[in-house]
């Protein structure tokens, strides 16, 4: 039996990173741009060879400086949607991003034939409607046999990575410091172990920091900058830790590649475990895929409520075999871009029904009335097709179609769409 592979693809504004997980392995591995080295970042750029339809990507694009014009910011350009002009020709920015992703996947020759990729997960900093739309178009253009493409935020990749680590590492809070460019992004993960299932929250914050890599050439001046960085990091770490129970800290990003942490590292290591690395998001994406396709007890024990998660249960009061019952339409904890449910119900009388929203924050359930204006009066029940989905983090779309009641009451072919916010 050939191995099946799960691919976790970390797509940031400046680089990509690829991890892969075999159905025969316990942990993911990460593709290195240099064999034998732990260099995982693939620069997010393309370069077109002047006068030819030949494209270089990643490290090769950086090396071939004299070959032609280079395009950076591929992800931002794709989301912006405006044509990219190269040699007086306009190129679709989503097509360029798709080309980059396809070329970067050529490195997966280490796993053999990509026909055996079972599922693919994109992970990026955040997911709004435009980002999901772009990623879906990229996925459609990759020519992979699998049709199982998924999307998740860095916060959820962090969560998935952590819940697959020994529990003593995250029994209390966990801090993730992601240092790129001149910004320190901080994720704080905490689990409420008093609920069933246990609810995991992640708070996100940003701090301006020193521009990483932009250091003086003179060693003494460079060390002075490092000292200032260390002092600022120490002050920030003390502030983040004040009054908090932090079990472990993860330091990721190019900003931590230089050895400038001295006093700040000593402080973080007091009664805490500190880890450094650069492939957490792509590995977290692999773990998420495995949990989605082959659920373990983790799925039953924990629910993650991130920014892009539905934070309320949505359902209807219905009758089953003469008894009052609850019909779940959407469950809290699902990502808004994955939230979709369809069903058929019978409306016994009238032209309206109620939707029930039950928040997970302990607030009272609230009811919303859906009125089907123009629905004909019938002596028989009306069969309704109902489809519910989400168009944003707090935006719900409800589609209803009149199916009538067989020959006794033919359908009026009426359709209704309602949009509401949670």
Question: Which residue stretches match the model-derived regions?
Answer:
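Conserved phosphate-binding catalytic cores of ATP/NTP-utilizing and phosphoryl-transfer enzymes
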Residues: 1-6, 144-175, 280-305, 378
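Conserved phosphate-binding loops in N-terminal lobes of ATP-dependent enzymes
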Residues: 32-123, 206-234
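Acidic, glycine/GT-rich loop-and beta-edge segments that sit at the periphery of enzyme/chaperone cores
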Residues: 287-373, 383
């Amino acid at each position: 039996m050939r191995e099946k592979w799960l691919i976790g693809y970390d797509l940031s504004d400046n680089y990509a990173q690829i991890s892969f997980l075999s159905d025969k392995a316990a942990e993911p591995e990460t593709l290195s741009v240099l064999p034998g080295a732990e260099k995982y970042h693939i620069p997010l750029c393309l370069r077109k060879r002047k006068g030819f339809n030949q494209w270089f990507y990643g490290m090769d694009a950086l090396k071939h400086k004299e070959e032609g014009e280079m395009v950076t910011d591929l992800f931002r350009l794709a989301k912006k949607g405006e044509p990219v002009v190269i040699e007086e020709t306009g190129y679709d920015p989503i097509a360029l991003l798709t080309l980059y992703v396809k070329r970067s996947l050529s490195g997966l020759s280490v796993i053999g034939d990509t026909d055996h990729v079972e599922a693919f997960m994109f992970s990026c900093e955040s997911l709004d409607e435009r980002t999901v739309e772009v990623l879906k178009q990229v996925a459609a253009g990759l020519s992979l046999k699998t049709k199982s493409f998924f999307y998740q935020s860095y916060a959820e990749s962090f969560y998935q990575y952590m819940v697959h680590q020994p529990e003593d590492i995250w029994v209390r809070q966990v801090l993730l410091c992601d240092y790129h460019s001149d910004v320190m992004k901080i994720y704080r993960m905490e689990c409420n172990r008093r609920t069933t299932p246990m609810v995991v929250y992640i708070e996100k914050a940003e701090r301006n920091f020193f521009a990483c890599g932009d250091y003086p050439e003179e060693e003494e001046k460079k060390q002075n900058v490092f000292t200032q960085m260390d002092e600022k990091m120490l002050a920030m770490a003390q502030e983040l830790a004040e009054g908090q129970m932090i079990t472990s800290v993860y330091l990721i990003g190019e900003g931590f590649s230089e050895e400038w942490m001295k006093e700040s590292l000593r402080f973080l290591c007091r009664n805490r475990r500190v880890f450094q690395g650069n492939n957490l998001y792509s590995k977290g994406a692999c773990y998420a895929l495995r949990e989605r396709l082959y659920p373990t007890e983790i799925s039953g024990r924990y629910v993650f409520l991130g920014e892009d998660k539905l934070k309320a249960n949505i359902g209807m009061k219905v009758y089953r075999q003469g008894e009052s019952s609850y019909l779940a339409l959407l469950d809290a904890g699902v990502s808004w871009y994955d939230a979709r449910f369809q069903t058929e119900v019978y409306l016994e009388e009238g032209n309206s029904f109620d939707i029930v929203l039950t928040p997970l924050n302990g607030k009272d359930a609230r009811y919303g009335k859906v009125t089907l204006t123009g629905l004909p009066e019938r002596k028989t029940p009306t069969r309704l097709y109902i489809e519910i989905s989400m168009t944003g983090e707090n935006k719900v779309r409800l589609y209803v179609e009149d199916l009538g009641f067989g020959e006794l009451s033919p359908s009026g072919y009426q359709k209704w769409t309602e949009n509401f916010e949670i």
